[in-house]
Amino acid sequence: MRLYLLALNPTDSVTEGFLPAADRLGLAVTVLTDQPDAHRTAYRHLAAPPEVLPCEVRDFREVVGLVSRHHAPDAVFSNSDHLQTQTALAAEYFGLPAKDWRAALRAKNKAQLRRHLAAVGLDTVRAVELAPGQPVSGIDPPFPCVVKPREGVASEDVALVADAAELAAHCAAVRQRRPQDALVVEEFLAGELHTLETLGDGTRRHVLGGFRTRISPPPHFVEEALEFVPEHPRPVVDQVLAQLDALGVGLGACHTEFVVQPDGRARIIEVNYRAIGDQCDLMLARLLDIPFFEHVLRVHLGEPLPAELGARTGRHGHNRAVLADRAGTLTAAPAAQEYEKDGVQLVYRPFRTVGEHHVHHRTNRDYLGVVWAVGDDRRAVDGAVEAFLAANRWEITP
């Protein structure tokens, strides 16, 4: 059986998660990407590197054409935020299990997500969509408000602005970097930030738990740490699931970010119709002790999920980012490592290599690496992460 996997840049989710899972399932994998050299380099260490073909994956017509000229597909899949709609359309073209492309579009397009949830009467967030070049002076948002690229990721160019002057300045700065991108200006949804991780086969849906997310101080929204939450309060989960149902989310993994307000109301921040990233999906699989990546691939092959996943309970997980606090060249950092000590499994993965120079983004793009740990004792898990951070050093030279 052949799996076509669509990707932009290489990610740990694919390299460490989905490709090994595909190998365990006996699948032949063809990676379609617009960055073939980067993927071939990323997969050199794998026992069975996949076939990598260059393709304009942002255009579903190019995907359909290439697959039609190559081997017959059994599944078309992507874990990229940017490629869910294209993947859904290509899979549907070949009559394969597919996400509803409308749901994929609603999740990716933050303005459309707001409009749809308001139209079905589930949640109304005051939001304005700004087309490229559209004057900011003509809108009247509630301050403070959040400005974000309509189809952005990784908190990039997202900021909280306090007044009209800050709004104009931030929009102008973003448009210098990405002049062709539409923006969304929306009311600030205050509350503690959480995630809900779900897995569905189109009929049955499992809630895998979620995370409590610590973010950086305003005006930016950088995810600094995530702690596993086995079960959110049932009324909160029901509200989030109702909104996912209204959006049409059903097949595969979904990572939803939301806040809970003092009155218990759950307000969605964004829906990422794929597995959670930045090593959290790998941590989740280890934490729950389930073949998470295999389950995701199986549903895209048309197989139903089991009634019970057999997830391990009573464990704690802690994911912590190591962030650059300035621009410069990374001149010292620990290597990738993994070990178990005193009942705690700890993993560290670098996101930058020593010698790389980067600007300071003030987003998740500033991650130098991620350390995570899982175990039965929360204090031991948290302590292992703190001990690792204290024992290692990351140096940036301007």
Where are these regions (language model features)?
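ATP-binding N-terminal substructure of ATP-dependent carboxylate-amine bond-forming enzymes
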Residues: 1-103, 324, 352-359, 363-366, ...
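Glycine-rich phosphate-binding loop signature in dinucleotide/nucleotide-binding domains
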Residues: 67-73, 139-141, 177-179
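A conserved helix-loop-beta module that forms one wall/lid of the active-site cleft
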Residues: 92-157, 162-164
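Peripheral (often C-terminal) accessory segments that flank ATP-dependent C-N-forming ligase machineries
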Residues: 136, 297-398
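Internal nucleotide-binding/catalytic subdomain
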Residues: 158-266
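Short, well-ordered beta-strand elements within core beta-sheets of diverse protein domains
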Residues: 159, 187, 285, 368-375
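Active-site "cap" helix and flanking loop/linker of ATP-utilizing ligase/carboxylase catalytic domains
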Residues: 5, 234-255, 262, 272-331
